[in-house]
């Protein structure tokens, strides 16, 4: 199902490229756009994960540089029966996280320093379990490729304004066609992102709760992240809005409503579903993830101290 969805999305993106190419240069422009789209599809499949990580200047960490964060992901991946993904930290005060990669064997998870600062051990585990669920369901291929292609289509729509209205080109639609392309192409690209059903977030929430062993860990994390995400701005996400749907909570300011134009379900609806799941679960489908040595250390996140100084008291029942 996910492979079919990915193919349909890529086909639609290709049609968008061809349509804008037609506006810019007629049939010749359409054929050039087709070649460019085919090349981008190929490139995105192999490189879109690296592109997204580079957009956010993500820093890869390991067991030595971020032992507790890395250990959480390692234990959760084992619970889920997944290969160990690459683990990254994003230097951003906004609490958020995402996963990327074309398949479970080539996947990566990334959490912001803001998330690692403000959440307890259990809440971090709930968030990373959610991201691993996306990897397990292979949502990451669709999300990452859609992000890169949607951004490119928006740029191509703007490109049409400078080169599509010239009388000397082969544009059969004139300046009106260029204006339509400028408006429709970015809107259509955004709608494609929304076409990736928001129900995948509910599915990842449920599977993530199973992986970490406690739905309330994730519900508590979602409340904290949503409360901060629209107060603490994320400049990198604002510059790259096509990647917003990849995050566990929409990182863009002003995206609060569960409506047709939202990339994420309403957070409170997700929390209610998780709390209902918690009531239904007598025991977790997997053993809850617990640290071997439940004491946060200053080296847990590179150069950050993972949220508190050495004199600050421990937080959470894991401490």
From Swiss-Prot:
GO CC terms of this entry: plasma membrane
Cofactor note: Binds 1 zinc ion per subunit.
Major localization class: membrane
Record InterPro entries: HtpX_protease, Pept_M48_protease_HtpX, Peptidase_M48
Required cofactor names: Zn(2+)
Transmembrane portions of the chain: 6-26, 28-48, 145-165, 172-192
E.C. code: 3.4.24.-
One of the GO BP terms on file: proteolysis
MF terms in GO: metalloendopeptidase activity; zinc ion binding
Organism domain of life: Bacteria
Keyword Calcium attributed: no
Cysteines engaged in disulfide bonds, as pairs: none
Active site residues per record: 131
CDD domains, per the entry: M48B_HtpX_like (cd07336)
Keywords: Cell inner membrane, Cell membrane, Hydrolase, Membrane, Metal-binding, Metalloprotease, Protease, Transmembrane, Transmembrane helix, Zinc
Residue span of region Disordered: 280-319
Membrane topology: Multi-pass membrane protein
Chain residues that bind Zn(2+): 130, 134, 201
Cell compartment(s), UniProt: Cell inner membrane
Family from the record: Belongs to the peptidase M48B family.
NCBIfam families registered for this protein in UniProt: PRK01345.1, PRK03001.1
Official protein name in the record: Protease HtpX homolog
Gene: htpX
């Amino acid at each position: 199902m996910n492979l079919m969805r990915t193919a349909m999305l890529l086909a639609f993106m290709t049609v968008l490229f061809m349509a804008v190419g037609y506006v810019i240069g007629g049939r010749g422009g359409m054929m050039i756009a087709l070649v460019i789209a085919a090349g981008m599809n190929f490139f995105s499949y192999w490189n879109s994960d690296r592109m997204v990580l580079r957009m956010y200047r993500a820093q890869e960490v390991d067991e030595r540089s971020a032992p507790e964060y890395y250990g959480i992901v390692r234990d959760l991946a084992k619970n889920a029966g997944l290969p160990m993904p690459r683990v990254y930290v994003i230097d951003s005060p906004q609490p958020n996280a995402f996963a990327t990669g074309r398949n479970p064997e080539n996947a990566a998870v990334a959490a912001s320093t803001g998330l690692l600062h403000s959440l307890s051990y259990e809440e971090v585990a709930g968030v990373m379990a959610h991201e691993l669920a996306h990897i397990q369901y292979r949502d990451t291929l669709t999300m990452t490729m859609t992000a890169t292609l949607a951004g490119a289509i928006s740029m191509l729509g703007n490109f049409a304004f400078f080169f599509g209205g010239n009388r000397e080109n082969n544009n059969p639609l004139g300046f009106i066609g260029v204006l339509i392309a400028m408006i429709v192409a970015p809107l259509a690209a955004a709608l494609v992102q929304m076409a990736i059903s928001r129900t995948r977030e509910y599915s990842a929430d449920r599977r993530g709760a199973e992986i970490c062993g406690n739905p309330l860990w994730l519900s508590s994390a979602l409340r904290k992240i949503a409360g901060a995400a629209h107060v603490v701005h994320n400049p990198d996400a604002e510059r790259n809005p096509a990647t917003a749907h990849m995050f566990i909570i929409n990182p863009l300011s002003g995206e609060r409503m569960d409506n047709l134009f939202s990339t994420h379900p309403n957070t409170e609806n997700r929390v209610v579903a998780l709390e209902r799941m918690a009531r239904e679960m007598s025991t977790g489908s997997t053993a809850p993830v617990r640290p071997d040595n439940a004491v946060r250390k200053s080296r847990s996140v590179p150069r950050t101290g993972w949220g508190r100084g050495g004199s600050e008291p421990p937080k959470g029942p894991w401490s």
